[in-house]
A protein has these predicted regions:
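Bacterial N-terminal signal peptides
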Residues: 8-18
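A conserved glycine-rich beta-strand in the N-terminal activation segment of trypsin-fold
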Residues: 22-29, 47-68, 94-96, 122-123, ...
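C-terminal recognition in membrane/secretory proteostasis and scaffolding
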Residues: 29, 67, 75, 98-99, ...
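Active-site region of chymotrypsin-like
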Residues: 37, 54, 114-126, 152-214, ...
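Active-site-proximal beta-strands of protease catalytic cores
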Residues: 37-42, 70-74, 97, 132-145, ...
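Conserved active-site neighborhood of the chymotrypsin/trypsin-like protease fold
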Residues: 46-47, 65-151, 179, 211-213, ...
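Gly/Ser-enriched beta-turn/beta-hairpin loop segments
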Residues: 48-54, 102-106, 162-180, 235-237, ...
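Beta-strand/loop subdomains of soluble extracytoplasmic proteins
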Residues: 83-98, 134-140, 150-166, 222-227, ...
Length: 353
């Protein structure tokens, strides 16, 4: 038995090695083609209202609209407060950056530079591909890892449904979203790096890492792509909230919380690849959802649609700001229907005093 397993492993390795060797030139061509659009960012920021301390640091960003001079990076790089920043391109040209958007919750934001200031380089735009991430997909993280200006780290996507990483009390922590995870070993300076596939498409945004392991955490691009479209069309990036945090729970835990067999059957049939549904984790006292939703409630329908994951929920909230939505949950096996006002998520973070 052991010999047969060893033989099978050798055969698999023998088959895979030519494929890997064939991919190397393709990766080389891709990385050379897109590297002009990746920049290192130097940041000096004051302490903001929302979790961030004053800092002088380095990070990464990449061009997503060369005509408008839009650079995508992390929220904790743009920061929620006043910031002085500059981008350094591959040929060491420097440009000043102006923050144009920082998401109130998720770890992404946009800077703008003046394209006319660039004299010797025409940076390539890196296309966003939110649907391009998949388990087992080979990726490269390109950025200013460890302050080296341009580093390339390889990895394989292992998870698409990781809970948002927790960096500790009093620090910025994302919520109401899944994260992607891969063992790519990113470190300081790689925040905001593009996570690209072999075609040069950005499938995720590097956001953080586990300092005691090789795990890296990537933000999905669904809401990022929407925000970019809004900015390109000179439209406000509307963001809605129920002032409630949700978490995804597996079906076995949902049954203990009172999920009915009918609801589980419907969810499994409609979304066969998903392994759970959303539950209420916390509700802010005094919010529109207070007294309506309770921790442990299982989210079933929103505006008549079966909602089992974060992207669908965020889309409904963002498109119904200052309007009421119909929400159906199950609590202890009983169904509860209610209407809740969607509030402006941007209004929760103060920006002046």
């Amino acid at each position: 038995m052991i010999q047969s397993r060893i033989f099978a492993a050798v055969v698999a390795l023998t088959i895979s090695l030519p494929a890997l060797a064939a991919e190397e030139p393709a990766w080389t061509q891709t990385l050379e083609r897109i590297s002009s659009g990746v920049v290192s960012i130097r940041v000096d920021s004051t302490r903001a209202f929302d979790t961030e301390w004053n800092t002088s640091s380095q990070a990464t960003g990449f061009v997503v609209d060369a005509k408008r001079g839009l650079i995508l990076t992390n929220r904790h790089v743009v920061t929620p407060g006043p910031v002085i920043a500059e981008a350094v391109f591959r040929n060491n040209e420097e440009v000043e950056l102006t923050p144009v958007y920082r998401d109130p919750v998720h770890d992404f934001g946009f800077f703008r530079y003046d394209p006319a200031e660039l004299r010797y380089i025409e940076p390539v735009e890196l296309p966003l591909a939110p649907g391009g991430a998949g388990i087992g997909k080979e990726i490269r993280v390109i950025g200013n890892d460890a302050g080296e200006q341009l580093s390339i780290l390889a990895g394989t996507i292992a998870r698409l449904d990781r809970k948002a990483p927790e960096y500790g009390r009093g620090k910025y922590n994302d919520f109401n979203t899944f994260y992607l995870q891969a063992a790519s070993g990113t470190s300081g300076g790689s925040s905001g790096s593009p996570v690209v596939n072999i075609d040069g498409e950005v499938v995720a945004l590097n956001a953080g890492a586990n300092s005691s392991a090789a795990s890296s955490f990537f933000l999905p691009l669904d809401r990022v792509e929407r925000a970019l479209r809004k900015l390109q069309n000179d439209e406000p990036v509307t963001r809605g909230t129920l002032q409630t945090t949700f978490r995804s729970e597996p079906y076995d835990e949902l049954r203990r919380l009172g999920l009915t067999e009918a609801s589980e059957t419907l969810a499994r049939k409609r979304f066969p690849s998903q392994t759970g549904m959303l539950t209420v984790e916390q509700v802010i006292p005094g919010s529109p959802a207070a007294g309506v939703l309770s921790p442990g409630d299982i989210l079933i329908n929103v505006n008549g649609e079966l909602v089992t994951e974060f992207v669908a929920l965020a889309a409904i909230l963002d498109n119904n700001v200052v309007h009421e939505i119909a929400v159906s949950v199950e609590r202890g096996g009983s169904r509860i229907d209610a209407r809740i006002q969607v509030e402006v998520l941007h209004a929760i973070t103060p920006d002046e005093y």
